[in-house]
């Protein structure tokens, strides 16, 4: 059956290559894996296996000029940092971030919503200004989540338990943020919680499949991709559940709600934005993909960093004991701001282990001429090589070294904080459309790591040659090791959390 479908797809790809793959390109260097005499289609097929090396080679050779990478189903124009500095304030009608994200995340299969920045408005206008009022709610739900996800250790055995660190922090983050996104009535619904976490896993596994085979293949064969099928069913369940909640709230307008679903309902401008199914879809998409998955990845990286260095772990634990002298129940926005060592580690961990090689992904909608005369053309997809820039020793001293307290040397100023977006901290994006949820993410990571440090000891179940479980590199994406097993046990002297 697959062969019957593979033949027409193969013919389409061959025609695409003949028509487009051999067209003369504009005069910027193309970074290739294979000799120029061979067809570029071979470079596209092998991009995922060699992406990190190709990006690094292109950056080192053409640091101050654009260069082209041949991805499976697109050309990516990699622009230098000075171009991003010029383009940082350009609006989305000229440089489109939404469609770029749609393409990069197999949007036709994963059904990422296009055409609206409603979620950005909700975070910028409602969530971020309300952080002082929102954080106590988040912390209360996180307290409940720890009781559900980790054993209380009241049997006196104090035994080590085996956990998958990614799944552990994914579940904690899902439970804590659900209350901020869907409110009290639904946030502890176990089916909703499991569906949301599973949707996150299935969506990103589908995206990984797409990056291996290309959007065309993935879209054509989506019905046979198990993770895509499961994610579609989960989306329908959430649309029914949250869509019904939107309609219920409209019928009971005297009720007061203060969550992401409600903010989007109130801020929706167009008829399409206001549809209950669209509101539900957007809430699930942002919750599972933009919040839960990325937070869980960052937390897993940080946990591995601490596990691989006992002195680092103990130094961070002492900081927590000094900041929260009577236990985790004292945690507040101010105490989290006082966690300077942890904040520095978070930023350094993300610098070395970002979610990918690139940020500032955009599709060009209008011709733009840069200061040196180079023109961005409509239809191009552009990005900046954030990992290469932030590990460049000409821009940052000893940039190749992992120094967890590197940013303490800057006296903990706002510009060196984890959540700051700048030319030295590019992985939250850059400019007008930098990640709006980075502030709540920072508090979430600190709250979870703080409690783990104060109340649990942890170590790897098995040794790795480098002591730290190696990252999983898939194309230009970087993931924490999801196969490593961590052992946890409660520390004997901890403050009981009610």
Swiss-Prot record:
Q: Which domain of life is it from?
A: Eukaryota
Cofactors named for this entry: heme
Swiss-Prot/TrEMBL keywords: Glycoprotein, Heme, Iron, Metal-binding, Monooxygenase, Oxidoreductase, Signal
Q: Which GO terms describe its biological process?
A: secondary metabolic process
Residues carrying sugar: 420
Q: Which GO terms describe its molecular function?
A: heme binding; iron ion binding; monooxygenase activity; oxidoreductase activity, acting on paired donors, with incorporation or reduction of molecular oxygen
Q: Does the keyword DNA damage apply?
A: no
In which pathway is this protein known to take part? Answer: Secondary metabolite biosynthesis
EC number, as in UniProt: 1.-.-.-
Please tell me where heme binds in this chain.
435
Q: What class of enzyme is it?
A: oxidoreductase
User: Does the keyword Signal feature in the UniProt annotation?
Assistant: yes
Q: Which residues form the signal peptide?
A: 1-21
The induction annotation reads: Expression is down-regulated when the stress-activated mitogen-activated protein kinase (sakA) is deleted.
General function of this protein: Cytochrome P450 monooxygenase; part of the gene clusters that mediates the biosynthesis of lolitrems, indole-diterpene mycotoxins that are potent tremorgens in mammals, and are synthesized by clavicipitaceous fungal endophytes in association with their grass hosts. The geranylgeranyl diphosphate (GGPP) synthase ltmG is proposed to catalyze the first step in lolitrem biosynthesis. LtmG catalyzes a series of iterative condensations of isopentenyl diphosphate (IPP) with dimethylallyl diphosphate (DMAPP), geranyl diphosphate (GPP), and farnesyl diphosphate (FPP), to form GGPP.
Family label: Belongs to the cytochrome P450 family.
Protein name in UniProt: Cytochrome P450 monooxygenase ltmP
Q: What is the lineage of its organism?
A: Eukaryota, Fungi, Dikarya, Ascomycota, Pezizomycotina
């Amino acid at each position: 059956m697959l062969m019957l479908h593979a033949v027409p797809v193969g013919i389409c790809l061959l025609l695409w290559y003949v028509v487009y793959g051999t067209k003369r390109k504009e005069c910027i260097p193309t970074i290739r894996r294979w000799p120029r005499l061979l067809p570029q289609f071979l470079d596209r097929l092998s991009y995922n296996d060699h992406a990190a090396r190709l990006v690094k080679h292109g950056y080192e050779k053409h640091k101050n000029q654009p260069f082209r990478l041949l991805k499976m189903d697109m050309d990516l124009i990699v622009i230098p940092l000075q171009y991003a500095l010029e383009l940082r304030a350009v609006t989305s009608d000229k440089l489109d971030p939404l469609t770029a994200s749609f393409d990069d995340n197999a949007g036709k299969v994963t059904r990422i919503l296009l055409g609206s920045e409603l979620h950005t408005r909700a975070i910028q206008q409602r969530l971020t200004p309300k952080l002082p009022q929102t954080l106590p709610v988040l912390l209360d739900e996180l307290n409940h989540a720890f009781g559900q996800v980790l054993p209380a250790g009241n049997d006196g055995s104090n035994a080590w338990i085996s956990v998958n660190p990614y799944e552990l922090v994914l579940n904690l983050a899902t439970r804590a943020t659900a209350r901020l996104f869907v409110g009290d009535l639904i946030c502890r619904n176990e089916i909703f919680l499991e569906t949301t976490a599973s949707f996150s896993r299935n969506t990103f596994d589908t995206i990984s499949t797409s990056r291996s085979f290309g959007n065309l293949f993935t879209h054509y064969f989506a019905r046979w991709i198990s993770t895509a099928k499961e994610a579609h069913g989960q989306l329908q369940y959430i649309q029914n559940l949250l869509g019904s909640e939107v309609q219920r709230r409209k019928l009971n307008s005297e009720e007061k709600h203060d969550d992401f679903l409600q903010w989007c309902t109130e801020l929706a401008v167009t008829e399409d934005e206001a549809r209950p199914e669209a509101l539900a879809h957007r809430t699930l998409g942002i919750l599972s993909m933009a919040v839960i998955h990325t937070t869980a990845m960052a937390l897993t990286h940080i946990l591995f960093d601490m596990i691989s260095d006992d002195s680092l772990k103990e130094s961070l634990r002492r900081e927590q004991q000094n900041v929260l002298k009577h236990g985790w129940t004292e945690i507040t926005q101010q105490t989290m701001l006082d966690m300077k060592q942890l904040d520095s580690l978070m930023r350094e961990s993300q610098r070395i282990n970002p979610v990918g090689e690139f940020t500032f992904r955009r599709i060009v909608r209008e011709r733009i001429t840069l200061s040196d005369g180079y023109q961005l053309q409509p239809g191009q997809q552009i990005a900046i090589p954030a990992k290469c820039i932030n590990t460049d020793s000409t821009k940052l001293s000893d940039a190749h070294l992992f120094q967890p307290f590197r940013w303490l040397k800057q006296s903990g100023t706002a510009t060196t904080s984890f959540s700051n977006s700048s030319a030295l901290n590019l992985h939250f994006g850059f400019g007008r459309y930098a990640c709006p949820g980075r502030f709540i993410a920072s508090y979430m990571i600190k709250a979870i790591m703080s409690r783990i440090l104060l109340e649990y000891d942890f170590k790897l179940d098995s040794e790795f040659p480098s002591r730290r479980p190696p990252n999983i590199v898939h194309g230009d994406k970087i993931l924490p090791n999801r196969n490593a097993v961590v052992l946890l046990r409660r520390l004997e002297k901890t403050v009981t959390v009610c």
